[in-house]
């Protein structure tokens, strides 16, 4: 007696298992037609498998008789309840609402059979003759109105999680790479400490509205100035925007000054913190903000900072100070505080616990020392110098630094907060 090769037995076993899986238990209709056939060869013998794999049929409108192979869902109206309907019927029903008396419908001479079929298929529309009138809306009772009001109050009630904040910065996202910065990657670089976590709660009173529970208090950072003070030489061609804003010494505006003449600039950064309990808002109303096309932003204050270079012995001004009227924004904030103001046309300001940072390499963040001789000097940086915005404390608005200028380099030391 010759036994069948093991490969043939294995193929027959696979075919039996595949057939048993395709034939559902208790199914009375014959299986669908064979659509796919897989063949392979092993040791010179050819094996094949037939499949009833599904065939994609695009959605179409049903017209006339549908072929038997079309995937159509049939729902019978002869009293049979499907599983989903039975489960819905088992749920507790809401108490009945008062409704108006139903209007008697005119009887149709044509009677529809009890076991009519409803066809549901993608792209199928009911014929115009079988269109039923829209059901009438039942008048709602007082209980339904009360239930709707209660649901509205429940949805509007504040939850424990942080809700969507509507008082955030308008038109600005510090994490957006598409924010326009005049093609300068160092202009107001955002050194934000971290993103607010989505699941955390608000710190009480902070980040939930505009602060008007006291007064702001601006404090410049003396160590920030001392760490990054340096001297730079630039041509007048690259200082055209700064010249428009009067950020240079008077000798730069003479008629004999050419574009390739160089200016010597004492550059330094500035970081101002609002450690008060109220927002520091611009002194000018929004409609009077000035648009600067060179820097592509609005200036909301006439004078936010003032820079002076004084002689170390006589305290006399040796370099003409200028007014720095930047735009105000929350560049970064301490942990637990959130940025709410941006350098835009809609909203500018400085929130409590946040910093307004100006790097040393942006326009007008300098003193023009082209006409200054080498020696020892004092750098004086004042914020809110004219006291245009009320503060809780004006004695911490000035920083003084000792500057040693060699003619090529500048060294800053001893930067402290001073009352004068």
UniProtKB/Swiss-Prot annotation:
InterPro entries found in the cross-reference section: LOX-like_protein, Lysyl_oxidase, Lysyl_oxidase_CS
The record's Gene Ontology cellular component field reads: collagen-containing extracellular matrix; extracellular space
The segments labelled Lysyl-oxidase like in the record are 216-420
Q: Where is the composition biased (Basic residues)?
A: 107-119, 134-147
Task: Report the EC code(s) recorded for this entry.
Answer: 1.4.3.13
Q: How is the cofactor bound?
A: Contains 1 lysine tyrosylquinone.
Positions of modified residues (2',4',5'-topaquinone): 358
| Posttranslational modification | The lysine tyrosylquinone cross-link (LTQ) is generated by condensation of the epsilon-amino group of a lysine with a topaquinone produced by oxidation of tyrosine.
Q: Where in the cell is it found?
A: Secreted, Extracellular space
Biased composition (Pro residues) is annotated at 93-105
Q: Where is this site: Cleavage?
A: 221-222
Cysteine-cysteine disulfides: 241-247, 294-343, 327-333, 354-364, 401-415
UniProt crosslink position (Lysine tyrosylquinone (Lys-Tyr)): 323-358
Q: Mind telling me what this protein is named? A: Protein-lysine 6-oxidase
Q: Which gene encodes it?
A: LOX
